[in-house]
Amino acid sequence: MQELKTLLDELKSQSFFNENEICVIGCSTSEVIGQKIGSVGSMEVAEAIFNALEEVKQDTGVSFAFQGCEHINRAVTIEREDFNPLTMEEVTVVPDVHAGGSLATYAYKHMNDPIVVEHISVPKGIDIGQTLIGMHIKHICVPVRTSVKQVGEAIVTIATSRPKKIGGERAKYE
């Protein structure tokens, strides 16, 4: 999956991934292989994407959160060590290919100590296949551009965030 490698390399060169941060990943493996979101799913594609992200994690120290599909209310699979009980609520569900999606399922099975949380608020994310990760990204979302527009057949959208600017005409920001 050369597009994914190129995408991740470009993001690393832009310092997109930071140690001790969480990046949410949404992915439709169906879309990657050219099918309608939620229709087919591919554990092979999920494995390739997960393994590529694991390499990034090892290189940069970033953690990844894997958004499930709408059938589990887009709940997010994370490592227990990333869980913050003050800002996250654990839920009882195990992602499955048909209720959670292939990537969240693969991640749950291959993470060290996975848990699923209802919602997170993280500074950045990568959406492969228009899975609607925006609900998990801090305000204010800012698009990130790379040369890679698709992974396989899936459209890729990347976002980071910035603090809100408040105050009005008298406020100073710099």
From Swiss-Prot:
Pfam families: DUF436. It comes from the Bacteria. InterPro entries: Antibiotic_NAT-like, DUF436. Belongs to the UPF0340 family. HAMAP family: UPF0340. This is UPF0340 protein SH0921. It comes from Staphylococcus haemolyticus (strain JCSC1435).
